[in-house]
Amino acid sequence: MLLFCPGCGNGLIVEEGQRCHRFACNTCPYVHNITRKVTNRKYPKLKEVDDVLGGAAAWENVDSTAESCPKCEHPRAYFMQLQTRSADEPMTTFYKCCNAQCGHRWRD
């Protein structure tokens, strides 16, 4: 846990005092004795993950091809091509199974 000095705003360090441990500031003379166990937990709020392929809307108007799904063996798959690397590299082809119950995604 990191506490800050109320006087100057710098981080406080823990040092051993005469009677107990204490929070002390290296910049100014602020000192606060620690008389009990200090705990504090804060869990950060997680961001929603953005689908880098554009989510479900990206697959609405794409073509399908005769590519077999590796998961369910369905004979057709939707596909789209994106440039994921530098311009001198070939485009990456992304597939999505046409079987509505499967919907498996993979890339070539």
Curated annotation (Swiss-Prot):
Zn(2+) 2 binds at residues 69, 72, 98, 102. A zinc finger (TFIIS-type) spans 65-107. Changing residue 41 to W: In HLD21; decrease in expression levels of RNA polymerase III-transcribed genes such as 5S and 7S ribosomal RNAs. A motif (Hairpin) lies at residues 88-89. InterPro entries: DNA-dir_RNA_pol-M_15_CS (IPR019761), Rpa12/Rpb9/Rpc10/TFS (IPR012164), Zn_ribbon_RPB9 (IPR001529), Zn_ribbon_RPC11_C (IPR034014), Znf_TFIIS (IPR001222). It comes from the Eukaryota. It is found in: Nucleus. Gene3D superfamilies: 2.20.25.10. Zn(2+) 1 binds at residues 5, 8, 25, 28. A zinc finger (C4-type) spans 5-28. GO terms for molecular function: DNA-directed RNA polymerase activity; nucleic acid binding; zinc ion binding. GO terms for cellular component: cytosol; nucleoplasm; RNA polymerase III complex. Keywords: Antiviral defense, Disease variant, DNA-directed RNA polymerase, Immunity, Innate immunity, Leukodystrophy, Metal-binding, Neurodegeneration, Nucleus, Transcription, Zinc, Zinc-finger. GO terms for biological process: defense response to virus; innate immune response; transcription by RNA polymerase III. Belongs to the archaeal RpoM/eukaryotic RPA12/RPB9/RPC11 RNA polymerase family. It is linked to Leukodystrophy, hypomyelinating, 21: An autosomal recessive neurodegenerative disorder characterized by global developmental delay, loss of motor, speech and cognitive milestones in the first decades of life, and diffuse hypomyelination of the white matter and atrophy of the cerebellum and corpus callosum observed on brain imaging. Clinical features include nystagmus, ataxia, dystonia, and spasticity. Other more variable features are feeding difficulties, poor overall growth with microcephaly, optic atrophy, and seizures. The disorder is progressive and may lead to premature death. Component of the RNA polymerase III complex consisting of 17 subunits: a ten-subunit horseshoe-shaped catalytic core composed of POLR3A/RPC1, POLR3B/RPC2, POLR1C/RPAC1, POLR1D/RPAC2, POLR3K/RPC10, POLR2E/RPABC1, POLR2F/RPABC2, POLR2H/RPABC3, POLR2K/RPABC4 and POLR2L/RPABC5; a mobile stalk composed of two subunits POLR3H/RPC8 and CRCP/RPC9, protruding from the core and functioning primarily in transcription initiation; and additional subunits homologous to general transcription factors of the RNA polymerase II machinery, POLR3C/RPC3-POLR3F/RPC6-POLR3G/RPC7 heterotrimer required for transcription initiation and POLR3D/RPC4-POLR3E/RPC5 heterodimer involved in both transcription initiation and termination. Core component of RNA polymerase III (Pol III) which synthesizes small non-coding RNAs using the four ribonucleoside triphosphates as substrates. Can mediate Pol I proofreading of the nascent RNA transcript. Anchors into the Pol III active site to constantly monitor transcription fidelity, cleaves mis-incorporated 5'-ribonucleotides and restarts the transcription process. Once Pol III reaches the poly(dT) termination signal, can induce Pol III clamp opening and transcription termination. The TFIIS-type zinc-binding beta-ribbon domain contains an acidic hairpin motif (residues Asp-88, Glu-89) that likely coordinates the nucleophilic water and magnesium to cleave the scissile phosphodiester bond and release the mis-incorporated 5'-ribonucleotides. This is DNA-directed RNA polymerase III subunit RPC10.
